[in-house]
Amino acid sequence: MEAKDVNYCVILAGGIGSRLWPVSRKELPKQFLDWFGTGRTLLQQTYDRFRKIIDAKHIFIVTNEHYADLVREQLPDVAQDRILKEPIRRNTLPSVAWATTCISHLCPHGNVIVSPADQLILEENNFDNDVLKGLDFVGHSDCLLTMGVKPTRPDTGYGYIQAHENMEEGAFARVKSFTEKPALDFARVFMESGEFY
């Protein structure tokens, strides 16, 4: 079996986008908007990005049942059984657990990348290469891999990954700590330390 045959992607598209109100609303959250005027919504851009490196039938979309029609409208080529509709919102962990359980029934030793539907990636070729490098790494290691970028400003809307040691760009390191959405004071300390991604 080729490596690409065991690579899967889960795109999380169930958020309500409340931080970007009034443009992003509960009825039409940011992942379903053409945020940057490209002619493609954030969800479509994320799907397109992963479709270049992962087989289309290996891409799952997790969304709230209220957004299932929007997903089908924006991604008509995605098979119905690849759109997982949550009856209620329970944040990230249950969404990831459900999707990876579905994938494990199809491919018990699959490599899975989980991505939000609403991220901005400016250097897509570098991103693609890093994702492929990460999938190759987990394919030969018994581990979880999280990818991060150096913060450019303190932000309370993101998690912060602390590496065990300083590392060069594109390298792998063990995670020392992870802090989910810290208070602004901590986010500032994390950013200024240079140890966090």
Question: Each predicted region: which residue ranges?
Answer:
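Conserved N-terminal catalytic core of the sugar/cofactor nucleotidyltransferase
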Residues: 1-11, 22-26, 37-116, 122-125, ...
